[in-house]
A protein has these predicted regions:
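N-terminal export/assembly segments and adjacent metallocofactor-ligating motifs
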Residues: 1-238
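Generic low-polarity alpha-helical segments
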Residues: 4-6, 142, 270, 302-305
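Active-site phosphate/pyrophosphate-binding segments
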Residues: 195-304
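Short, surface-exposed connector motifs at secondary-structure boundaries
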Residues: 70-80, 246-252, 305
């Protein structure tokens, strides 16, 4: 998500800038937002509807779709609408009206970069299938696992504005937050971390469990079974655990994995640290990514049967 202003010359958009009046992005933009304007001038983009890969008129396409929908309605069949996340109230109302008319209609939301494991993990942990609001501005200790929250994860422009709040040393703010990052490839977020450690994708779950066990030992909670990592990685995890524990309630652990198990353990870490209500708000949700892997998989199964 990015609230923007567009500079126009002779009716043509030529430059994107952030909207400083936005309470979410606060005037920020991203490379993705800046580059999106180029798609308007892509001569290879689709300019007409197509049928079987060939250009067709809107009249032909509309008639064919309407005829097929009417045939499905007459037979009492199912209609699925596959879409990216829908947040517009007017679009939701149109879909609802569509479903009322045709009946037996379901909206399936899908995202190319899925984070549905977060919502599923929160449903398991708290009974709420949501993506909570994260506040990096309240965190003095941040640990990330394969999570490019400054580049591409969920709401990077919003998170960047929050993150830099505690990364600038001033006369009134002489202390800077500390950021540990574990990832398999270099990301924008990892390059800005104070401590960065390369961890194989196959070892990410072990690293998360190791951090959980270190925090659980300090909290007097039960630990989880898991394998061991190399001594250098364990040493950095020890340092991260100590810094997190010293900043209980003012810390944040995030994970970019779309694995429900990993996200559930991360929930446990944040819970032991008392971060809910401070750096994580379950009462305020992020609705940008509403796609559900389970719904898409179910749709594929139904189409194959």
């Amino acid at each position: 998500y990015c609230s923007i202003l567009v500079k126009v010359r002779d009716g043509r958009p030529i430059k994107i800038e952030g909207n400083k009046f936005s309470t979410v992005t606060k005037g920020g933009t991203s490379a993705r937002a800046q580059g999106s304007i180029l798609s308007l001038y892509d001569k290879y983009r689709l300019q007409n509807p197509t049928v079987g890969g060939k250009n067709a008129s809107w009249e032909v396409v509309d008639k064919e779709i309407a005829d097929q929908l009417s045939a499905v309605k007459a037979k009492g069949g199912k209609i699925k609408i596959l879409s990216s996340s829908v947040n517009s109230p007017s679009t939701k109302q149109l879909i609802a009206d569509f479903g009322t008319y045709f009946g037996n209609t379901e909206l399936i939301q899908w995202e190319p970069i899925s984070v549905s494991a977060i919502a599923t993990a929160n449903e398991k942990s708290f009974g709420k299938k949501i993506i909570p609001a994260y506040n990096f501005g309240n965190a003095w200790s941040v640990v990330g696992f394969g999570c490019d929250f400054l580049g591409s994860w969920i709401s990077p422009i919003e998170f960047t504005k929050q993150y830099v709040k505690n990364r600038k040393i001033t006369h009134d703010n002489p202390v800077m937050s500390k950021h540990f990052h574990f990832e398999s490839r270099l990301s924008l977020t990892g390059s800005n971390a104070d401590v960065r450690r390369v961890v194989k994708p196959s070892q990410e779950g072990l690293a998360i469990i190791s951090l959980y066990n270190k925090i659980a030992s300090k909290a007097g909670a039960s630990t989880l079974s898991g394998g061991s990592l190399d001594s250098a990685t364990e040493k950095i995890l020890d340092e991260a655990a100590n810094h997190l524990w010293d900043n209980k309630g003012k810390s944040l652990v995030v994970c970019g994995s779309n694995c429900v198990s990993n996200q559930t353990v991360v929930n446990g870490i944040n819970n032991l640290l008392g971060n809910y209500g401070s750096t994580i708000d379950l009462g305020s949700t992020i609705n940008l990514n509403q796609g559900s892997d389970a719904d898409v998989n179910r749709l594929v199964d139904e189409m194959n049967n």
